[in-house]
Amino acid sequence: MFRGVGTAIVTPFKNGELDLESYERLVRYQLENGVNALIVLGTTGESPTVNEDEREKLVSRTLEIVDGKIPVIVGAGTNSTEKTLKLVKQAEKLGANGVLVVTPYYNKPTQEGLYQHYKYISERTDLGIVVYNVPGRTGVNVLPETAARIAADLKNVVGIKEANPDIDQIDRTVSLTKQARSDFMVWSGNDDRTFYLLCAGGDGVISVVSNVAPKQMVELCAEYFSGNLEKSREVHRKLRPLMKALFVETNPIPVKAALNLMGFIENELRLPLVPASEKTVELLRNVLKESGLL
């Protein structure tokens, strides 16, 4: 589907409503700086608080702006298989290139339940499906063996966003899924694990940091793929303070504050999320200045 950087883009709000004008500026900023895909309505896009009509508006506008230049992948995960399928079919109807389907959360399915969840959805859509493993939020972990089983059996499941920070799991997930199917893709779901995942044989990152620093995140991956390991490592090291600062509070609270400081969006979230503290805003201001982004 893509190699490199897919930006998990924020959803701007203004006075409680979608701010499509600011959103267009942000999408164009991503395109101008060479990102390889956009992921709409993921965790960073505050998908739990965006209603069905707003989803349609946001996805449609994204597809209009992008105009086929890069893939548009839509977040479509819930903890109900049938509700998830409904969101997948909406994305399919709107013309998305793929869907990001988070593991069912709260109800804590077994590994067999996870497999059957993705099997059920994959049999009912032609879209490429990306498994999203983020156990820190969901309470359930896709084991490498399960990811490999999915890769082997479900041909329109194109890859996994691996947001388990454990480096042993990253290694095993990349190794076992690539053995199961050579074209199965593994993206880091944690910006600070991107360089490591690339070294393990992965394919890039679905990134929060690239909302703010798309050029630098693209460079990190591009240099690695070009064989310039030390240059890629250097870019990673320079980005570390920003990677750390953007997660001092729950994502997407800090990244929205950073984009507000940069003049892209209002610093507005929907409850139960609230804007960043003054301490966090000051930290972000300093890090953005040091990074040459302010």
Swiss-Prot record:
Pyruvate binds at T44, I206. Transmembrane segments: none annotated. It is an enzyme of class 4 (lyase). It is found in: Cytoplasm. The record marks T43, Y106 as: Part of a proton relay during catalysis. Pfam families: DHDPS (PF00701). Keywords: Amino-acid biosynthesis, Cytoplasm, Diaminopimelate biosynthesis, Lyase, Lysine biosynthesis, Schiff base. Signal peptide: none annotated. Is not inhibited by (S)-lysine, in contrast to E.coli DapA. Its EC number is 4.3.3.7. The active site is at Y132, K161. Disulfide bonds: none annotated. Pathway: Amino-acid biosynthesis; L-lysine biosynthesis via DAP pathway; (S)-tetrahydrodipicolinate from L-aspartate: step 3/4. PROSITE patterns: DHDPS_1, DHDPS_2. GO terms for cellular component: cytosol. NCBIfam families: dapA. Belongs to the DapA family. PANTHER family: 4-HYDROXY-2-OXOGLUTARATE ALDOLASE, MITOCHONDRIAL, DIHYDRODIPICOLINATE SYNTHASE. Catalyzes the condensation of (S)-aspartate-beta-semialdehyde [(S)-ASA] and pyruvate to 4-hydroxy-tetrahydrodipicolinate (HTPA). This is 4-hydroxy-tetrahydrodipicolinate synthase.
